[in-house]
Amino acid sequence: MRPRQNPFQRPVCTTALAGARIPMTFTLQIGDRAPEFRLPATDGKTYALSDFAGDAVLVIFFTCNHCPYVTGSDEDTRRTVEKFSGSGVRFVAINSNSRNTYSEDDFPHMVERMREHGFPWVYLHDEAQEVARAYGALRTPHFYVFDRERRLIYTGRAIDQPRQSEKAKTHDLNRALEEHLAGKPVTVPVTNPIGCNVKWEGRDAHWMPAEACDLV
């Protein structure tokens, strides 16, 4: 039987340091380059980071199939893609969740979900979770925005109410993209991602790296 989803449960932390304000060493920092990857997609192809070299801006976001913060905000994300796709912004989704924690997050369900909803992004499967570790993915959804040189310029949430996107008052991702495309620095480059934690293989469903626990 799969574990019951409780989006409001605090992550399971493994050290007393979790209660202290410490540097976020687990996830990418502003200015870091996008780590390489090569992953299978729901369209039957395999994609590497270099396949998106022609795009001026690359938005990589970690997502899944089951999380209510994902399903509650997917249509808002779709609108963001449609708004910025004509400006050279490319969106790439990655599912790194363990299928042994939530069977809905397996690859066949990814294919089915894309077929049903027709989302305007590439949907990649990170079964080994190596890409999630390289990027330091914390939540689903968790967004990373990279400039033409593939340096990180924004990381965190897309909106402040992903579970009920119609109630969103702050559109952090849109603002970051608008500022960057206008040639301006991103005024708020880091926000806490809001969502379900990544489901790590062999870990409790609510486990997160200790150094992340105070910052999500």
Features from the language model and the residues they span:
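Short terminal or interdomain "cap/linker" segment that borders an active site or interface and mediates
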Residues: 207
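Chalcogenol-based redox active-site neighborhoods
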Residues: 2, 6-189, 204, 212-216
